[in-house]
């Protein structure tokens, strides 16, 4: 039987269409996925992301452990609260999961990992943590919500003040730069998200989340479901685990090369040797596609192009959808290296030209691609 988040009954009261998402009953939409998408780009929306897994790591060797476990380097995290995005790789360089890690104190780090990968992630972390004496604690007593959009931060700050947080805590939250987290009273507030908009992701006790949700709705924040979350993240060029990358895909072939910390050269993290070989040999690449003609780019459609040697090459769309912000169809596609600015996608029995772009289409409500 599918699990329920602490907000399940609230979703029903809000009119959500519920679906089974990796073993969790989650809202797909609350009437109009399109309206929910636009509200996040123009104002503020709230998502229930309590199905995701929060894992706290404690121990004097926690930083050393994470420098071995993760492809990005937590040595970069010197200011308490600072976070980074990283892949957690297997020995062959495949992506076990992508996650966010927060540095809280020298012996206390926090991970937020995907729901679909929870069991294998925890098993992998526990397997490698033992040698470092790191204590692992899953924080399933915490709910997680994401409030996203150009008005999101202002509305959350006002609510935190109304809930009795000190002026000092509210000011500290308001002054956070992107990719920071801070414990403010019962709330862990982070300037992270999955939409390409400003906002917060907020962890709070399960028993407080319904009240918090209702108070945000009362100040005009709109509930949003998985459907809008997917089109928003696709417009932002953000990967979805299981579609755009998985254990058989290198981060170098998933537009995650920037998350690999190659220096210092003597840091031996899991998967490094395989990545060095892949970098020398060359890999496929993840690109963006824009279709301006009538039609919708869908997952698993083939993408064809002729390389500089006149050879026909083929790739595949990993994520595709209509873009509500741009009014055209967009996609992420994994293709052989050497693709130019144009390619061909076959939709039913029509061959349609697509423009090849960097894998990112919208930021802060504005187009960042030309087509």
Swiss-Prot record:
Cystines in this chain: none
Keyword Transferase: yes
EC identifiers of the protein: 2.1.2.10
Enzyme class: transferase
GO aspect biological process, one term: glycine decarboxylation via glycine cleavage system
InterPro entries reported for this sequence: GCS_T, GCS_T_bac, GCST_C, GCV_T_N, GcvT/YgfZ/DmdA, GcvT/YgfZ_C, TrmE/GcvT_dom1
PANTHER family: AMINOMETHYLTRANSFERASE, AMINOMETHYLTRANSFERASE, MITOCHONDRIAL
Family: Belongs to the GcvT family.
Complex and partners: The glycine cleavage system is composed of four proteins: P, T, L and H.
Name the record gives this protein: Aminomethyltransferase
Biological source species: Pectobacterium atrosepticum (strain SCRI 1043 / ATCC BAA-672)
């Amino acid at each position: 039987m599918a699990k329920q988040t602490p907000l399940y009954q609230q979703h029903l009261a809000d009119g959500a269409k519920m679906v089974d998402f990796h073993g969790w009953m989650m809202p797909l939409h609350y009437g109009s996925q399109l309206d929910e998408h636009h509200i996040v780009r123009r104002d503020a929306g709230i998502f229930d992301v309590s199905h995701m897994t929060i894992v706290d790591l404690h121990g004097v060797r926690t930083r050393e452990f994470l420098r071995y476990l993760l492809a990005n380097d937590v040595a970069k995290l010197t200011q308490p609260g600072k976070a980074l995005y990283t892949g957690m790789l297997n020995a062959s360089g495949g992506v076990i999961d992508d996650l966010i890690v927060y540095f809280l104190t020298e012996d206390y780090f926090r991970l937020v990992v995907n729901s679909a990968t929870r069991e294998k992630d925890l098993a992998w972390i526990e397997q490698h943590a033992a040698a470092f004496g790191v204590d692992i604690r899953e924080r399933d007593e915490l709910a997680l919500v994401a409030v996203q959009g150009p008005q999101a931060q202002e509305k959350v700050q006002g609510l935190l003040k109304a809930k009795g947080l000190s002026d000092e805590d509210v000011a500290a939250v308001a002054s956070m730069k992107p990719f920071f987290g801070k414990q403010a009273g019962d709330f862990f507030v982070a300037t992270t998200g999955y939409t390409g908009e400003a906002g917060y992701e907020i962890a709070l006790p399960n028993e407080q989340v319904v009240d918090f949700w209702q108070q945000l709705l009362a100040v005009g924040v709109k509930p949003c479901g998985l459907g809008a979350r997917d089109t928003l993240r696709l417009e932002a060029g953000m990967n979805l685990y299981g579609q755009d990358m998985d254990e058989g895909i290198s981060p170098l072939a998933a537009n995650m090369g920037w998350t690999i910390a190659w220096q210092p050269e003597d840091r031996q993290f899991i998967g490094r040797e395989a990545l060095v070989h892949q970098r020398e040999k060359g890999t496929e690449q993840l690109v963006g596609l824009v279709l301006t003609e009538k039609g919708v780019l869908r997952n698993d459609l083939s993408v064809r192009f002729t390389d500089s040697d006149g050879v026909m090459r083929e790739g595949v769309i990993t994520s595709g959808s209509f873009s509500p912000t741009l009014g055209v169809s967009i996609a992420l596609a994994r293709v052989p290296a050497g693709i130019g600015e144009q390619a061909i996608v076959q939709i039913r029995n029509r061959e349609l030209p697509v423009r090849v772009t960097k894998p990112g289409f919208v930021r802060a409500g504005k187009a960042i691609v030309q087509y």
